[in-house]
């Protein structure tokens, strides 16, 4: 350490040659939001000096050819599992888009396999050209109102904190447990605070009083604000605002209305859950930066939000800027307005050029057998899919909202025959099913959903946040049963069924969440799924599978379905499908 420090100081003092010198660039100063011509001097993967051109010498020189030299981007909150590829493949996709650090919460795979799932993600994230700051999930399961594949106790959380690869405590979704001072939750928070770890937020729908208590618990950031008012409420309380733009949840447009040059230093960008095809086609955090620039945000401010702000939020003192003492994670950007990224450097090494990774990645870590055999369920029968209702009363329905993971709780009259709900294509009232798939419990929840617009068939997936049971939506029971059976046969993934026949399936053999294939193979499989969904009459401008995957998450308002039944998030309790007379008064 001393020798390394002395060498760094000798180079910084211009008494020794550096490892690398980047010349002919315009350095992006994210501290003062300006640019200047200068050289970047690098030793041992760290920036040791910025200088006027020609001041320093190095063993190797790289000519930036007039490009802007900016700090690399940080994704402040992501579930790698939602990309549907393993961490090694995920890195191949996001690094060429300028992202060299992610704050990852593996609670998807933890809900399937507990500590074993977290440890797999830690192992799979080592030795790749992407810094993965792994959080330990705080809410596995998210609530006691669903059956997950595993639990993470306070004792297990505390034990995981002993692993130096664990960065902090993942998003606290069970906010009622915080407000009621549930002792299990208190133990997890205390363990994080005693270790000096970051605690991530998930304060969906919190009012001002609840938000006060939530912040007082030491939760310093939140990605669940969905309106300008909610954004300001978090900023007023000193929280960092994480501006989310993923595949299902698209909050960027609403939240940026609350951002000004005066408060932008407390805002940063996150993807949360983003499918592989969108990561490939439009990008990761670079997509946020482009969108910000397109709506008139100063490009330097947008870059600052994606780098320095994120680094400061997560106390990453050596990341987020082009300055002495900072890690040499940087980008060459030809044009700021279009954010044309040509080169990505990680620890002073060029790892990507023109949208492609140019360094090899080690062989993929083999997942434990438990993750490869994660669909263990009892046979689902047609009788279990029956939903008893009275024909002369309204029913509680889940109304999806494209571009959001928040649903609306609505009441409508539905088609009923012989006391059983009949899906109606004309009314867009389809059957929603959540079937437990981890421990052969045989529990099945059945509800009614509006907004998918399917006219025939069924779709199903084992990606069902956060307990990741099987969730399916369809126009008839036969296709629903066939879709559920197909997922059991392929040990997890996505499937589309019509007239009892499987049109296409996308196997996700790692925990029913991620593929063991390369990202380009998975991209082609996704294209096949996208092409086949039209056969069911789907014409929506949203991703039906990702939207479906959030309909079983009982910590996101307003109403959801778990394997145990219909759940009213507002009252935080189960409700009957039927609307009774006393409810209408």
Curated annotation (Swiss-Prot):
One of its GO terms (molecular function) is adenine deaminase activity. Its EC number is 3.5.4.2. InterPro entries: Adenine_deam, Adenine_deam_C, Amidohydro-rel, Metal-dep_hydrolase_composite, Metal_Hydrolase. GO terms for biological process: adenine catabolic process. Keywords: Hydrolase, Manganese. It catalyses: adenine + H2O + H(+) = hypoxanthine + NH4(+). Its cofactor is Mn(2+). It is an enzyme of class 3 (hydrolase). NCBIfam families: ade (TIGR01178). Belongs to the metallo-dependent hydrolases superfamily. Adenine deaminase family. This is Adenine deaminase.
């Amino acid at each position: 350490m001393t020798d390394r420090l002395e060498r760094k100081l000798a180079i910084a003092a211009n008494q020794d040659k550096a490892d690398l010198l980047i010349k002919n660039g315009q350095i992006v100063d994210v501290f003062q939001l300006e640019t200047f011509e200068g050289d970047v001097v690098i030793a041992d993967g760290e920036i040791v000096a910025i200088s006027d051109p020609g001041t320093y010498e190095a063993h190797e020189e790289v000519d930036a050819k007039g490009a802007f030299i900016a700090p690399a981007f940080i994704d402040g909150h992501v579930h790698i599992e939602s990309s549907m590829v393993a961490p090694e493949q995920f890195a191949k996709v996001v690094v060429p888009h300028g992202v060299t650090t992610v704050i990852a919460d593996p609670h998807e795979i933890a809900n399937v396999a507990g500590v074993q799932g977290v440890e797999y993600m830690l192992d799979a994230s080592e030795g790749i050209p992407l810094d993965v700051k792994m959080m330990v999930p705080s809410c596995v399961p998210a609530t006691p109102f669903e059956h997950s594949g595993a639990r993470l106790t306070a004792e297990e959380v505390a034990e995981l904190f002993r692993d130096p690869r664990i960065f902090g405590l993942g998003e606290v979704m069970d906010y009622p447990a915080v407000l009621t001072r549930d002792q299990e939750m208190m133990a997890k928070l205390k363990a994080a605070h005693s270790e000096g770890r970051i605690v991530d937020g998930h304060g969906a729908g919190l009012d001002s009083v609840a938000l006060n208590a939530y912040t007082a618990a030491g939760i310093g950031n939140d990605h669940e604000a969905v309106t300008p008012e909610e954004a300001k409420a978090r900023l007023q309380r000193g929280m960092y605002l994480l501006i989310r733009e993923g595949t299902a949840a698209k909050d960027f447009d609403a939240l940026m209305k609350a951002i000004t040059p005066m408060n932008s230093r407390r805002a940063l960008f996150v993807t949360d859950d983003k499918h592989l095809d969108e990561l490939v086609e439009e990008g990761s955090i670079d997509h946020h930066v482009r969108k910000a620039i397109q709506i008139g945000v100063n490009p330097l401010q947008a870059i600052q939000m994606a780098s320095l702000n994120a680094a400061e939020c997560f106390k990453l003192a050596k990341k987020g800027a082009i300055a002495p003492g900072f890690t040499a994670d940087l980008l060459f950007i030809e044009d700021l307005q279009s954010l044309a990224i040509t080169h990505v450097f990680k620890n002073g090494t060029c790892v990507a050029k023109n949208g492609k990774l140019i360094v090899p990645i080690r062989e993929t870590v083999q997942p434990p057998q438990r993750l490869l055999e994660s669909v263990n369920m009892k046979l689902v029968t047609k009788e279990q899919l029956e939903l008893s209702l009275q024909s002369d009363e309204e029913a509680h329905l889940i109304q999806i909202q494209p571009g959001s993971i928040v649903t609306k709780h609505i009441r409508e009259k539905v088609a009923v025959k012989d006391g059983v709900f009949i899906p109606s294509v004309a009314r867009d009232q389809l059957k929603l099913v959540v079937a437990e798939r981890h421990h052969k419990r045989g529990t099945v929840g059945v509800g009614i959903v509006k907004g998918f617009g399917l006219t025939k068939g069924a779709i199903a997936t084992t990606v069902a946040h956060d307990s990741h049971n099987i969730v399916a939506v369809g126009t008839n029971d036969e296709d629903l049963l066939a879709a559920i059976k197909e997922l059991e046969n392929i040990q997890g993934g996505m499937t589309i069924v019509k007239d009892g026949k499987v049109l296409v399936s996308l196997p996700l053999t790692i925990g029913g969440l991620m593929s063991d294939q390369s990202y380009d193979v998975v991209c082609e499989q996704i294209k096949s799924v996208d092409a086949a969904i039209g056969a069911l009459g789907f014409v929506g401008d949203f991703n039906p599978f990702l939207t479906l995957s959030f309909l079983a998450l009982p910590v996101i308002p307003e109403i959801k379905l778990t394997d145990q039944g219909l759940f009213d998030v507002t009252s935080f309790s189960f409700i009957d499908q039927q609307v009774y007379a006393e409810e209408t008064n």
